[in-house]
Design a protein with these regions (language model features):
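Outer membrane beta-barrel transmembrane domains
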Residues: 258, 273-276, 305-327, 343, ...
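Signature for the C-terminal beta-barrel architecture of outer-membrane proteins
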Residues: 211-344, 348-351, 357-360, 377
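Outer membrane beta-barrel
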Residues: 101-249, 276, 365-405
Length: 464
């Protein structure tokens, strides 16, 4: 490796670890939501409390092990649902970045969901436990050098531990719920279903929120923190979510894995989101079919989010007359939209698009804004209704203070002010519980100072 390459790798080591903590779980839409199978009941997937009362999951069609001879159905009827998913990625940097090379990354996800009313008569009560285990290497940290990351399974270190553990109480006829416990914000905030097929982390939790500020960062994959979350669904077309979450200290990002953050002095994050579904409000002709009974559910969502941390954070490079860092509020906002654009008549096959934009104060962390857009087609071919194909792009821009800090640490000017990633992928459902997903990414200006990189690989996912 050249001298410049070694310097770049040393410089971006800490920075990359910060952004890697923004990886999300398909096992991790943020590593947690994509682990679920198509018909799995998941009260943590962002729906209202009433959504958790849907039909019994069809394990024969969505898992390798099926119904366990009827045992899974009996457990479900008693109020217990268990799911185990293993995902394995192999990605390789073929050109550009830090250096050529690849890495395997594995992720095991065990989810246990409990219905309080069925188990102990706790009306409106539920519990959720998720354990995760990471194995393998780090293709972005060691080979690509992207600020945003390239794979939503990659974590700074390999560990096994608790990721989610919360209790929930629903009330107001299931139109509201209060959730308390270990809670990652990427399970419900900044979520677009049509982007969940992609492997790039920024199509889960966006880069400007996932990046750590000068003092602390968010509770997201792979490190969670304790929180209290209130959700209100006054109407099927509207929802509002508000959460107060303990921050993850920035001084431990290099060692943070899938474990719990209890450290004091890291501040707290307040985040809120309001969303609206034009389709559920009856504003769109979302069911172009002659059948009276149509189970097709179009993707349709508009949302606005706001977040801020307390206390105030030190600015990255700005100082006062005495040479002490200036303090500023670490905050941001985002808007998102996704919508089914076209549906194959008389089917569940559809083309959807998403668009997301978010910005920050630009003083207390590297990025000041990012945006992403893409298309995904569920059931692109006749007879392949469970497959999904997609193409998407995301761009993250570094603010003036972020660029100044990176340039000073590197000892030379940066080659760009922004990093852009484009991804194409095809997720093929080969059998019940078995999916294979090839992917190609092109990373422009990785790390704002490295040659453009091309990344290719494949994901294997097994729902057991």
């Amino acid at each position: 490796m050249s001298v410049q390459g070694k310097r770049l790798r040393a410089l971006y080591g800490a920075t990359l670890l910060s952004f890697l903590l923004g990886s999300s779980l398909a096992v991790p839409v943020a590593a947690a939501e994509e682990v679920t199978t198509d018909e799995e009941v998941n009260t943590d997937a962002g729906g209202s409390a009433a959504d958790a009362t849907d039909a019994t999951p069809n394990w024969q069609e969505t898992t390798l092990s099926g119904d366990w001879g009827g045992s899974r159905k009996r457990l479900y009827d008693a109020g217990v649902q268990a799911d185990l998913v293993y995902s394995a990625d192999y990605l390789r940097d073929t050109t550009g970045g830090l250096k050529r090379g690849g890495a395997y990354m594995g992720h095991l996800d065990l989810i246990l969901q409990l219905d309080g009313e069925k188990l102990v008569g706790w009306r409106g009560g539920s519990a959720y436990l998720q354990l995760i285990s990471n194995t393998g290497g780090r293709v972005n940290l060691n080979h690509v050098g992207s600020l945003m990351g390239v794979d939503n399974l990659e974590a700074p270190v390999n560990r096994t531990g608790i990721f989610k553990a919360w209790l929930q109480q629903s009330f107001l006829d299931d139109k509201a719920s209060l959730r308390v416990g270990l809670y990652p914000i990427d399970s419900e905030f900044y979520v677009t279903d049509s982007s969940s097929v992609f492997l790039h982390p920024s199509f889960g939790m966006a880069a400007e929120v996932a990046s750590f500020g000068s003092l602390a960062g968010p509770s997201i994959y792979p490190t969670s923190s304790y929180a209290a979350r209130l959700r209100i669904d006054p109407d099927p077309a509207w929802y509002a979510i508000l959460a107060v979450v303990r921050g993850i200290p920035s001084d431990r990002i290099a060692t943070a894995g899938p474990n719990v953050s209890w450290q004091k002095g890291s501040g707290s994050m307040l985040i809120g989101e309001v969303g609206f579904s034009p389709a559920k409000a009856g504003l769109l002709d979302d069911r172009p079919t002659s059948e009276e009974k149509d189970e097709f559910e179009p993707i349709s969502k508009l949302a606005l989010g706001l977040w801020r941390y307390s206390p105030r954070f030190p600015e990255l490079v700005a100082v006062d007359a005495g040479g002490e860092p200036l303090l500023a509020t670490h905050w941001g906002a985002y808007v998102l939209a996704e919508q089914t654009l076209w549906r194959v008549p008389e089917s569940n096959r559809d083309l959807a698009a998403f668009l997301r934009y978010g910005f920050t104060d630009g003083k207390t962390n590297t990025l000041d804004y990012s945006f992403s857009a893409g298309l995904s087609f569920r059931g692109p071919f006749a007879g392949r209704e469970k497959d999904t194909i997609g193409i998407a792009a995301t761009r993250a821009h570094a603010g003036s203070q972020g660029r100044a800090q990176l340039s000073a640490e590197l000892g030379q000017p940066l080659s760009s002010t922004a990093e852009t990633a484009v991804e194409m992928t095809y997720r093929a459902q080969l059998a019940p519980g078995v999916a294979l997903q090839p992917v190609v990414q092109r990373i422009f200006n990785p790390g704002l100072a490295l040659p453009n990189a091309t990344v290719a690989g494949v994901r294997l996912q097994l729902a057991l």
